[in-house]
Amino acid sequence: MLGFETIGNATITVFDGEPILVTDPWILGNPYFGSWGHKYKIPQQQLENIKNSKYVWLSHGHPDHTDPDSLNLFADKTFLIADHYGDRIYNDLKKKYNVIKIKNNEWFELSEKIRIKNFADWNQDSTIIIEINRNEIILNLNDR
């Protein structure tokens, strides 16, 4: 499959024959001191696609995006982080995970047919453009 699927308000899984990229995959845990939880069950096939993605892109450092219960499921994956001012998110994640800092406004190739470009703002948040097969564009503004 070449394309994408979504679940929740921030998670996109992108495919190029297999799951290549997942964005902001909060799938376990109850962040914000237990005050947040899922009101839906992620279908098993979507959950497998999320977990099998090669790359994990995180838009910002809020607890629902960096929940340890979810992130630990991706310990063997590569995390992609925008070049945020001060590098707090990058520095925190690289203590435990394989992390690549993506330069702003530059294409980053994930596979033969998938590439991304992200933009960080001054407030430790970011937006991602996902290009599929050089003819489809996805703009993920996540929590905005």
Question: Where do the protein language model's features map onto the residues?
Answer:
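Extreme N-terminal starter segment of soluble prokaryotic enzymes
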Residues: 1-5
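Pre-active-site segment of Zn-dependent metallo-hydrolases
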Residues: 18-57, 68-69, 144
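A short helix->loop->beta-strand "cap" motif at the edges of active sites that frequently abuts
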Residues: 19, 75-79
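Metallo-beta-lactamase
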Residues: 27-28, 82-144
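Catalytic phosphate/metal-binding cores of nucleic-acid and nucleotide-processing enzymes, i.e., regions
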Residues: 62
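Metal-dependent catalytic neighborhoods of phosphoester/phosphodiester hydrolases
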Residues: 67-76
